[in-house]
């Protein structure tokens, strides 16, 4: 795994789209589907077959038999009518290929959302670590102050132990947060298939009023339904007339025969044949048609459900965005209030007006509100990304704005 020094969210996303292993695998599958389509693109072209055979008769040969016969042939064939089977196969592969292209875009969109979520989760944990590190510095300073007072018999040991316990708990919290941060960084590095060393703060553009568009997932489902429609045509084609045209040129060579009797053996023959076949009775084809029809019906129901689901997700994403904005404004006020209360309590604590329980409670509320505010800032960015992509907008146009 190589190392990149990507700093912004956009740089990490671009690197991920280029190097992600799953995306590479999907691209290979798309190429396979394209080759499958190209393989049937010229399905109506004539076929040409060449061959040769040799036969030898031993024992009890009659005078009118040839001992050794060699044959070479060239056969040209063309299907004049196959009940629409070849055209259906061609269309089916075309629809499957385009469904794969849409599926690739869907996978890339989902990957971008994963990266955005992980990026801002990493920022949240990093911001929280800084908040608790600041808390640790404050606790350490207060611990040293109280320890000095204890040494000169101006306070009791429980004051010292309470601050020491709070400080040690804070250090454990920081260690736990660093583990979470490391886990998230490894996850985003796995997606990018590269080790990322640094994460700068990035914000997404403010979201304007978006309208719901059909997503690439919907487009892929529509292509798959069309492909299943062609499967029905393929299954039905066996119950229609089949007309073929064949022309065979045969060259013969002989040895070990009575040339006095067999004087008119042919050396060259050309045979033109037009064949018409019709399937009068076939129970298996009827079942194949029914299976294909049911599969198409199931896909249509799945499409209807997915459309309703996307509409619901879009509405919820918009509601979530508005809720996160309200939460952000509320927490901003809470942070200001917590900071103000803490400053007042600190002065009272240092002057012995309130005890350490009141002081630590004020400090904890201040730290808690600051951590929540940092988290809300990052969750707001995640909500923006979800709103963008749940609208069905093309991920490429979104990235251009970021």
Spell out what each predicted region is.
Residues 17-24, 31-46, 74-92, 102-109, ...:
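A glycine-/polar-enriched beta->alpha junction
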Residues 150-154, 349-353, 390:
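A short glycine-centered flexible hinge/capping loop motif at secondary-structure junctions
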Residues 2-7, 11, 108-219, 223-226, ...:
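Periplasmic alpha-helical coiled-coil/stalk elements that build and connect Gram-negative outer-membrane
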